Regions:
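Non-catalytic cell-wall polysaccharide-engagement segments
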Residues: 1-41, 100-193
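Short, solvent-exposed segments of well-ordered alpha helices
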Residues: 8, 53-57, 82, 109
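Short, well-structured alpha-helical interface segments that form or flank functional binding sites
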Residues: 16, 58-61, 82-85, 113
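Short, functionally critical alpha-helical segments immediately adjacent to catalytic or ligand/cofactor-binding
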Residues: 39-48, 54-74, 118
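Generic alpha-helical secondary structure signal
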Residues: 61, 89-93, 117
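Amphipathic alpha-helical interaction surfaces
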Residues: 68-73, 93-97, 121-124
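Short, solvent-exposed loop/turn and secondary-structure capping segments
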Residues: 76-81
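Substrate-binding/active-site groove segments that recognize
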Residues: 82-101
Length: 193
């Protein structure tokens, strides 16, 4: 399993978090990986043409960029006066509602379980809304559940970091395809045979 760049790579538990996220993305996160959100070009230009491995790498990077703004990469973080827990600040009742393995505050402070739960949530909301962070009268996609995505400055910070990653590069050549011989022959006044 190739380990993609993540924004949390400077943290001691980063490799375990990345592996947990990749495992979840290959299992219950498959609907997330299959979806090409309508706003993906602003986040990761190469995503739409990328293979599943590249798409999973994007989501790991996305989770790590979101964790910067949710918990400053602290798996044991508790916010909202004891309401939200872990790397991605998940409410235990939300975790239970989505069928996550981690359903208590204590369990959600396990980095891998928190990420697995976040992927379970996003695997429902991103395909449902076909979006990462779109506001068409109400917030859609990941932004429906995670507040940092409602901040233009935080979205810009996350998207800028993600666009700089190798897994977000466009992998197909922008060079135009050659025209079929039959079209070139017709254009020069001769009929193709």
């Amino acid at each position: 399993m190739e380990i993609p760049n993540a924004r949390w790579d400077h943290r001691p538990s980063s490799a375990a978090w990345t592996r947990s996220a990749l495992t979840a993305l290959a299992q219950h996160g498959t609907p997330l990986v299959r979806t090409v959100p309508r706003d993906i070009a602003s986040w990761c230009p190469g995503y739409a043409s990328g293979e599943a491995t590249q798409r999973r790498a994007f989501w790991v990077g996305f989770l790590s960029a979101l964790a910067k703004h949710e918990s400053t990469y602290r798996a044991k973080a508790v916010g909202g006066g004891g309401l939200w827990y872990g790397l991605l600040q998940i409410l235990p009742s939300t975790a239970r509602g989505y069928g996550c393995k981690a359903t208590s505050g204590g369990a959600l402070t396990n980095g891998g379980d928190n990420l697995s739960c976040a992927i379970r949530i996003m695997a429902r909301t991103v395909p449902r809304d076909n979006a990462i962070a779109v506001n068409d009268g109400r917030w859609r996609g990941v932004a429906a559940d995670w507040g940092p995505l409602r901040s233009a400055a935080k979205r810009a910070d996350m998207a800028s970091w993600l666009r700089g990653q190798e897994y977000c590069a466009i992998t197909r050549s922008p060079r135009p395809q050659l025209r079929p011989k039959s079209i070139e022959t017709q254009r020069s006044g001769r009929t193709a045979r």
